[in-house]
Structure formats: C-alpha cells, structure tokens
UniProtKB/Swiss-Prot annotation:
Catalytic activity: Hydrolyzes glycerol monoesters of long-chain fatty acids; a 1-acylglycerol + H2O = glycerol + a fatty acid + H(+); a 2-acylglycerol + H2O = glycerol + a fatty acid + H(+); 1-octanoylglycerol + H2O = octanoate + glycerol + H(+)
InterPro entries per UniProt: AB_hydrolase_1, AB_hydrolase_fold, Hydrolase_4, MAG_DAG_Lipase
Name of protein: Monoglyceride lipase
Source organism of this protein record: Rattus norvegicus (Rat)
Expression sites by tissue: Ubiquitous. Highly expressed in adipose tissue, adrenal gland, ovary, heart, spleen, lung, skeletal muscle, kidney and testis. Highly expressed throughout the brain.
C-alpha cells in the first residue's frame, strides 16, 4: 500500500479513523471526547485541559455534567495526549484558541439554539479566557479552575524570563525542567495516577513552550478588561504553579456583573483531583453554578 494512503495515526499508533477526531486549520489531527446525555442537551460545555495533560483526566467532572443533561466535549490540544504535534510544542498560543473555537463551531452546528459554556483548567483557563474575549457575546458563561493568569513568581522571575527569551533564539528545545507532580495535589493517590499516566507528557517543559505560556499571560492581562460574561473562578491558595494572586486580579479587572471567586485555603493546583473535601466542594460549586446559569440562559432563549 502506498505510504500516502496509510491512515493517520495517533502518537500511540492508533488510526484516527477509529477514534473521534477533528482536523484543525493546519491539517493536524486532534483526538476528541464527547460525553452526550440521552436526550437533547440543556447546554454545551467545552473543557480545555492544562499543559502536558489530556482531556481524559476530566471524565469524572464531565460525567457529572452529563448527568445534568449537558453535552460535554473536549479535545487534546496540539502536542498533547492523543493529538498530533511535537510534545508540548506549539507555534503560537493562538493555535489553542483557534482550535477551541473551531470545535465549538462544529458542535454548535447540531445544537444552534443551545447555550454554550467554557470550562478551563490552568493553561486551559488561559485558552478559555482568550476565546471568551475574542467572542464576547458567544458564550453564556465560563468556569475557571486554577487558571493561568499570573505565572508563579519563583519560576518566572525577571532574570529567568530574560534567560528563557535569550535561550529561545539559540536553544528553543532545551528543557526548563519537569513539572513537579508533588505540587499538583495534596492527594497522593491522584499524584500517583498522574505520574503513571502514559498520555501525560512527563518530559521537561521546553524553552519554546515556556515562552508561549509567558506570551499567553501577557495576552490574558490585556483581555481581562473585556471579559463581560458570567464566570466562576475556583482557586487554591497554596497553588505553586499558577499564582493565586491572579484570581484576585481577574476579579478586579473584569467588568462582568456576574463573577464569583471561591478560594480554597491550603489547596494546591488541581482542585478537581485534590483531597476529597476540596474535590467534592469543587464539583458541588460547578454543579450549582452552571445549573443556575443554564436556567438563566434558557429563559433568554424563550420567545
């Protein structure tokens, strides 16, 4: 069989023709997941995952939303999970935003009158913020879990940022070091699952990717004053990856008339995989918040 006719395969060597996927504007294949309720969905919710991970880690959260008659959908970002692309490398952070909007457009074609929400964690929070700012009237609300708004001051000091920018010109693929999994959660079993997950990129963050994250932080700062949609912001006070001060900055900067911040004292970065009392609270907060906003959005759609 000629090579040109061979099916495209995931980095794990599974043919994309056997998997749900979309093809982005650059011709890259992205692995997708869908959690569909049995009847007509009350809302569409796109889940945007964080750096180095994949959308399968949001199954528990998605299943909860599905039980509320919501259609949850997601994809592995370029360079992540089962999607194509060099691991944790992207030519421009806008690619993540563009792909999100493409996926939303695709799903909305089948449900044009159903309100759509965004849910983003960490880097996925930054992607969601930028998507919402790009389409200020498109989304009915947004849920942010430990979003990337401010980088951790220890890892993004002025000297380190300058060094990274210089290295990006000469050694863009050199590693800045691995993500320390012990700072993700106080739940050791969840940390162990993270460490053993073969779909997570456990290699170090490359300089070129770190620069894209810094660029995203700058873009988010400029976008926050344009965020007028309702949003729920969940943040751990002891987050060592995304500075918790960013949560307060977003609350101050956004002109939204419907914005809620829930700060979890002592909690780490991955709140939906934290100690049971934190994770249960997070799921409850999301459940309550999104159910109410769906009712409001549905009322607006009535003739």
């Amino acid at each position: 069989m000629p090579e040109a006719s061979s099916p495209r395969r995931t980095p794990q060597n599974v043919p994309y023709q056997d998997l749900p996927h979309l093809v982005n504007a650059d011709g890259q294949y992205l692995f997708c997941r869908y959690w569909k309720p049995s009847g007509t969905p009350k809302a569409l919710i796109f889940v945007s995952h964080g750096a180095g991970e994949h959308c399968g880690r949001y199954d528990e959260l998605a299943q909860m939303l599905k039980r509320l008659d919501m259609l949850v959908f997601a994809h592995d970002h370029v360079g992540h999970g089962q999607s194509e692309g060099e691991r944790m490398v992207v030519s421009d952070f806008q690619v993540f935003v563009r792909d999100l909007l493409q996926h939303v457009n695709t799903v909305q074609k089948d449900y044009p009158e159903v309100p759509v929400f965004l849910l983003g964690h960490s880097m996925g929070g930054a992607i969601s913020i930028l998507a919402a700012a790009e389409r200020p009237t498109h989304f009915s609300g947004m849920i942010l879990i430990s979003p990337l708004i401010l980088a951790n001051p220890e890892s993004a000091s002025t000297l380190k940022v300058l060094a990274a920018k210089l290295l990006n010109f000469v050694l863009p693929n050199i590693s800045l070091g691995r993500i320390d999994s012990s700072v993700l959660s106080r739940n050791k079993s969840e940390v162990d699952l993270y460490n053993s997950d073969p779909l997570i990129c456990h290699a170090g963050v490359k300089v070129c990717f770190g620069i894209q994250l810094l660029n995203a932080v700058s873009r988010v700062e400029r976008a926050m004053p344009r965020l007028t949609l309702p949003f729920l912001l969940l943040q751990g006070s002891a987050d060592r990856l995304c500075d918790s001060k960013g949560a307060y900055l977003l609350m101050e900067s956004s002109p939204s008339q419907d914005k809620t911040l829930k700060m979890y004292e002592g909690a780490y970065h991955v709140l939906h995989k934290e100690l049971p009392e934190v994770t249960n609270s997070v799921l409850h907060e999301i459940n309550t918040w999104v159910s109410h906003r769906i009712a409001v959005a549905g009322a607006r759609c009535l003739p």
